Amino acid sequence: MTNRQWETLREYDEIKYEFYEGIAKVTINRPEVRNAFTPKTVSEMIDAFSRARDDQNVSVIVLTGEGDLAFCSGGDQKKRGHGGYVGEDQIPRLNVLDLQRLIRIIPKPVIAMVKGYAVGGGNVLNVVCDLTIAADNAIFGQTGPKVGSFDAGYGSGYLARIVGHKKAREIWYLCRQYNAQEALDMGLVNTVVPLEKVEDETVQWCKEIMKHSPTALRFLKAAMNADTDGLAGLQQMAGDATLLYYTTDEAKEGRDAFKEKRDPDFDQFPKFP
């Protein structure tokens, strides 16, 4: 593996947030519990992803877990209380749902770099990422029905879009675990590489993506999300279109005419068929 110097952009307690040549990397840093997340972990990830979204130097975001044994094993069951996962404020939450949605609406590609276990809520995080680079030691699966839990949102509905309804039901009903090759065969990941090469491969994919139009990628992501996200997906795509329209001379003419208290001259702009 190439020895890269990742720059720490912000210090957190339960995650790492780093940067390298246009790539932001968010790492769940709780290896002692196979990178299971708490409400605090999720809050920190939401903050880091929000910063990556706003950072003009970031083109692609990578989500991963600390160490080689686990990407993420889902919610920390020791923190699970009455009505959700209980944080330091003693309020039960399911704020990972907010994180899932954020990953979907960020107008930049998000790549899951999976080493070891991606199970339970960890597999759902893998599912909502745009792409997945898996190490050959990766293990995928859902555990919810074993521990009195389930994900009836992206973790089931969108999973079924990816792997097919029959396979998604198998994954949830049987709670089996699947190796990297099996995950590749069902379309749950994009590629499988040796563990020692997984970061090199992920960075290579990021660099290839960064050669392409960020606006085109933004609209492609929004378009592919729109059919599964209902009106919220259409709102996201419409918002992206509005932002792009604001950059045109036609939109600026309307704005300037209002500010200058005159009628806008829209006849000067082409009316494409």
Curated annotation (Swiss-Prot):
GO terms for cellular component: cytosol. InterPro entries: ClpP/crotonase-like_dom_sf (IPR029045), DHNA-CoA_synthase_MenB (IPR010198), Enoyl-CoA_hydra/iso (IPR001753), Enoyl-CoA_hydra_C (IPR014748). Belongs to the enoyl-CoA hydratase/isomerase family. MenB subfamily. The record marks Y85, Y246 as: Important for catalysis. It comes from Staphylococcus aureus (strain MSSA476). PANTHER family: 1,4-DIHYDROXY-2-NAPHTHOYL-COA SYNTHASE, PEROXISOMAL, NUCLEOSIDE-DIPHOSPHATE-SUGAR EPIMERASE. Substrate binds at residues 34, 73-77, 85, 117-121, 143, 149, 246, 261. The lineage of its organism: Bacteria, Bacillati, Bacillota, Bacilli, Bacillales. Residues 254-273 are annotated as: Disordered. Keywords: Lyase, Menaquinone biosynthesis. It catalyses: 2-succinylbenzoyl-CoA + H(+) = 1,4-dihydroxy-2-naphthoyl-CoA + H2O. This is 1,4-dihydroxy-2-naphthoyl-CoA synthase. One of its GO terms (biological process) is menaquinone biosynthetic process. Transmembrane segments: none annotated. Converts o-succinylbenzoyl-CoA (OSB-CoA) to 1,4-dihydroxy-2-naphthoyl-CoA (DHNA-CoA). Hydrogencarbonate binds at Q142, T143, G144.
